[in-house]
Amino acid sequence: LFMVEEQIRDNLSSRLKNLGSHLIRVKLININTKKTLQIMAERIKDKKMDIEDCVFLSKHISTFLEVYDPISSSYVLEVSSGGLARPLTMIDDYEQFKYNKAKIVLKDKFLGKKTFKGFLKGVDKNGKILLETESDKIKFNFFEIEKANIDPNWAAKNN
């Protein structure tokens, strides 16, 4: 699945950019025998996405996928915004959403745990992601992160 997601991401990213949108995430989900291809995107100019944007992108993405055909079996296409709990999928996201509260889940335990919540402080000059928790200032390498999201239960401090 991961390979297919990467191929779709690589092929869709520049196409969406040409349409004024930024690709957030591509995820192929198997539930029983049904496949769903989830595409998350946002407008480049204001980082938002409304229903008209989703319909517009869905038509373009569907046309592209019919020609490109990366998934051999049938599937359902879902196009949406990143939502309030927007995933942080690229290293640039950690700088863009600086000062927002985030939840970061690591691939391996660090300081005895895998999940950390705190305020994003951006990316340092060495490419380490900075997170300020209630008790500490922590640095992570991007490749150590399994998944991360904006925490919608906290408003941005200064954005």
Roles of regions detected by a PLM:
Residues 1-159:
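Short Lys/Arg-rich amphipathic alpha-helical segments
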